[in-house]
Amino acid sequence: VPYLEISNIGGGGAKIQAVEGRPMGDIYVQVPQMNENGEYLVSDKGLYMNQTELQRVGNINPDGVGGLFSSFSYKNIFLDFSIDFRIGGDVINEMYQYSTASGLTPESLQFRDTEHGGLSYYYPGNNNASGVPVQVDPSLGAGPNGETVYHDGVILPGVVASTGEKNTRIIPAGYYYNQTYNWGTQPEQLTYRHSVFDNSYVKLRELTIGYQFPEKLISKLGMTRLSVSVFGRNLFYFYKALKNYDAESSVGTSWASQAVVGGSTTATRNFGVSLRASF
């Protein structure tokens, strides 16, 4: 058996595998084809064409994890804190994948209009269904026959697979995102390669500030120790490579499911008050 499939994400669009001769937990996804010159191959639809086999793009295992706990006190005031960290290890961000397909992420603003790099074009005869878009100057108010001019065009860098010529096919930004991101392995250009991210972080796990009452005061109450404190948990990240998502918002608790972001509840901060007494 050359490999074992540990996890299947998005109907086979991404997989976590244990491959003979490789560290366990490699991430495999569909990636675009290239020619011998390193240029992407573009279909007649204006979209990239994926290779037939999934390719390795990362590994879910971190290079290191750890934590730090420390406590300080001054007279009767004390402060405790704990910090957790993770170095390396990739995650597959399903939430990012599907949100980008729907135009809900900041990254999907690219090409949406002229301000964000979109090209201007029209469909001859306003034939949006089967017409080939024609690029025009952004200042043009309408096509030669009064056609609607759109400003959300994108031309993907590469060469047309069927001709070997430079790609000049304009496609709408929404079409590009929906056909490139999304769920599954179809259409042929869909890929999870943009949704694999480093998950390194340094996090303030817990912070406690409290006051310990003097022994001579509490001894009259029959106590040997009395303290009151306020605490907070999951307060913030000092550093987080995974932007806009909580680094611990995985779909499960197993070592493989922790490498998939999506479908979890919203991360929360917890605050509280603690009163501890010893008799």
Regions flagged by a language model, labelled:
Residues 1-279:
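Outer/extracellular conduits and scaffolds centered on Gram-negative outer-membrane beta-barrels
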